[in-house]
């Protein structure tokens, strides 16, 4: 079966027109190699080293150089790529392998790259605290190069002068507390628009039995917020009377989420660069199409704004885009080129949309199935905020149970299986294992958050666990890396403060403003996870009934 799958895939690719002779030769060599290895995979393989079931992984005692972390024996040249291709999606294969081996650190070799996966908080802290400086770089991949405009932004660029420059810009000008406060009113406007939009959806039919697509609502709230902060606009196209997205806004979010799903997606040519251009799995084509879709919308706004500032037509700053364009160097010249502005605008957009929307969708799904948890959250909102005004960002410090629900969603249902990879700048040792220079270290979001040696009943949605040891103010960040909400360290998340505000306001407004219930005929919300990612397998659709006085649902401001 494995051989037939490889040969069928090869036949599909060979049907593509206009391949050069050298490309065909490379492809044939690759297919022959895979066919041979696929047959060889039928033979039993020797088991790999297992670690203790009660502690984080540690290597066997001995002398000499430390071993690599446990993992499958790699093949020459291609490493473990054949196993990866036959066990898609790759992240589920890696996690299953680690469970079977009983290890919290593992190594698979993809092409010539050692990929080290970690599911233990102690080892994760060793990477991002003790050795943060050595793991400060990023991999060079087709998707990251494309989405960063040739590594011109901060999040995706490898360690070097360009990353240092763009990171300074973000730290001093974009994610600083003063800038967060400066754009407070825009975030509030979008929270108000969210409230009215859901109200319109919930009341548009006389029967009142209207299903609300929570994923649609949550993602477009996040899209609205980032467009307002970045471009000072909710819409790229015509405003919608009900406050919802139009066709261009739907296209924008679809392209952004497609792009995020393609970043560091275990593409074969990222590990065998000589295959780049053949696009064996279609990855490169989809990356290009998604990037064009995002850039077509962003560039129209950025080009016009650049012209306005250069001509003197624009004089006052209103958003992040104005900040980036008007930055000056020591000589009074523009600090950023227009290409850097475009790359960083996309960077900021990618950083802020997926985590809040995913966490809120999962949390609401879990809570509809667990009325006691829902009741606790509603009681806190009624006690802290009441029903005579809408929840505001100033209420966030007091909404500890609401934040505990979001923390639990981050823990149990992370937005991605792994964090963005960290690349080792030099040979090092982690947890007693050898990690060679150039290795890609990935912290498993699902492995950390669901580690049974760290969490009691790890698969249970139980927000109270975050109140037992927390201080008076529950934070969405997790400093001990028992799970990952927003990444930390020198390559930490650029949108942690913004992401916290967006998550709590999105969740708070949905909970305070509406009573949520399962649609008629549905006994329980299906909490199945998608096979290809960590989102819900099916978008969450619920019945929403307004629970506040009608005058509190603000009118649409477009």
From Swiss-Prot:
> SUPFAM superfamilies of this UniProt entry?
Cytochrome P450
**PANTHER family from the entry?**
CYTOCHROME P450 98A9, OS09G0441700 PROTEIN
Q: What is its EC number?
A: 1.14.14.36
Would the keyword Transport be found if you checked this record's keyword annotation? no
What family name appears in the similarity comment?
Belongs to the cytochrome P450 family.
| Catalysis: reaction(s) | L-tyrosine + 2 reduced [NADPH--hemoprotein reductase] + 2 O2 = (E)-4-hydroxyphenylacetaldehyde oxime + 2 oxidized [NADPH--hemoprotein reductase] + CO2 + 3 H2O + 2 H(+); L-tyrosine + reduced [NADPH--hemoprotein reductase] + O2 = N-hydroxy-L-tyrosine + oxidized [NADPH--hemoprotein reductase] + H2O + 2 H(+); N-hydroxy-L-tyrosine + reduced [NADPH--hemoprotein reductase] + O2 = N,N-dihydroxy-L-tyrosine + oxidized [NADPH--hemoprotein reductase] + H2O + H(+); N,N-dihydroxy-L-tyrosine + H(+) = (E)-4-hydroxyphenylacetaldehyde oxime + CO2 + H2O
GO CC, alphabetical: endoplasmic reticulum membrane
User: Can you cite a GO biological process for this protein?
Assistant: dhurrin biosynthetic process
The pathway this protein participates in, as annotated, is:
Secondary metabolite biosynthesis; dhurrin biosynthesis; dhurrin from L-tyrosine: step 1/3
Protein name, per record: Tyrosine N-monooxygenase
Q: Where is this region: Disordered?
A: 48-67
Q: What is the stated purpose of this protein?
A: Cytochrome P450 involved in the biosynthesis of the cyanogenic glucoside dhurrin. Catalyzes the conversion of L-tyrosine to p-hydroxyphenylacetaldehyde oxime, via the N-hydroxy-L-tyrosine and N,N-dihydroxy-L-tyrosine intermediates. Produces the (E) isomer of the final oxime product.
Q: Which source organism does the UniProt entry give? A: Sorghum bicolor
Q: Name the PROSITE patterns for this protein.
A: CYTOCHROME_P450
Topology versus the membrane: Single-pass membrane protein
């Amino acid at each position: 079966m494995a051989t037939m799958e490889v040969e069928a895939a090869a036949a599909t690719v060979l049907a593509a027109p206009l391949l050069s002779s050298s490309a065909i030769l490379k492809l044939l060599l690759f297919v022959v190699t895979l066919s041979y290895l696929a047959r060889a995979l039928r033979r039993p393989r020797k088991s790999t080293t297992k670690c203790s079931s009660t502690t984080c992984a540690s290597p066997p005692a001995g002398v000499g150089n430390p071993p690599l972390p446990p993992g499958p024996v790699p093949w020459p040249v291609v490493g473990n790529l054949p196993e990866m291709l036959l066990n898609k999606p790759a992240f589920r294969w890696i996690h299953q392998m680690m469970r079977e081996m009983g290890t919290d650190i593992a190594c698979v070799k993809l092409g010539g790259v050692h990929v080290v996966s970690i599911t233990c908080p102690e080892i994760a802290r060793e990477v991002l605290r003790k050795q943060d400086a050595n793991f400060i770089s990023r991999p060079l991949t087709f998707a990251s190069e494309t989405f960063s405009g040739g590594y011109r932004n901060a999040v995706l660029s490898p360690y070097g002068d360009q990353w240092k420059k763009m990171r300074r810009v973000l730290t001093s000008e974009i994610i600083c507390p003063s800038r967060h406060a400066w754009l407070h009113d825009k975030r509030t406007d979008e929270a108000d628009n969210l409230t009215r939009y859901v109200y319109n959806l919930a009341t548009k039919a006389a029967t009142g039995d209207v299903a609300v697509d929570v994923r649609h609502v949550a993602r477009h709230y996040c899209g609205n917020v980032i467009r307002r902060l970045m471009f000072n606009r909710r819409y790229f196209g015509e405003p919608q009377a009900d406050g919802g997205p139009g066709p261009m806004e739907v296209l924008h979010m679809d392209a952004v989420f497609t792009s995020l799903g393609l970043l560091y997606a275990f593409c074969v040519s990222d590990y065998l660069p000589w295959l780049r251009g053949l696009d064996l799995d279609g990855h490169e084509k989809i990356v290009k199409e998604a990037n064009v879709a995002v850039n077509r919308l962003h560039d129209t706004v950025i080009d016009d704004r650049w012209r306005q500032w250069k001509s003197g037509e624009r004089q006052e700053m209103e958003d992040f885009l104005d900040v980036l364009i008007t930055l000056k160097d020591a000589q009074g010249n523009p600090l950023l080129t227009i290409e850097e502005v475009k790359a960083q605008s996309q960077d900021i957009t990618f950083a802020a949309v997926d985590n809040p929307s995913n966490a809120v969708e999962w949390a609401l799904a879990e809570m509809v199935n667990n009325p006691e948890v829902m009741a606790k959250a509603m009681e806190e909102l009624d006690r802290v905020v009441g029903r005579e005004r809408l929840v505001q960002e100033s209420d966030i410090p007091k909404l500890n149970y609401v934040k505990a629900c979001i923390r639990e969603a981050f823990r149990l249902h992370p937005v991605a299986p792994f964090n963005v990879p960290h690349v080792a700048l030099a040979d090092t040792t982690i947890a007693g294992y050898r990690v060679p220079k150039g290795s890609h270290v990935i912290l498993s979001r699902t492995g950390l958050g669901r580690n049974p040696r760290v969490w009691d009943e790890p698969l249970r949605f139980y927000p109270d666990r975050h109140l037992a040891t927390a201080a008076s103010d529950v934070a969405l960040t997790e400093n001990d890396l028992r799970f990952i909400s927003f990444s930390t360290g020198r390559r930490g998340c650029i949108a942690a403060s913004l992401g916290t505000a967006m998550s709590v306001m999105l969740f708070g407004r949905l909970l305070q403003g509406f009573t949520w219930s399962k649609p008629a005929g549905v006994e329980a919300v299906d909490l199945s996870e998608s096979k290809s990612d960590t989102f819900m397998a099916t978008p969450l659709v619920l019945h929403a009934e307004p629970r506040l006085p009608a005058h509190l649902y603000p009118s649409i401001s477009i």
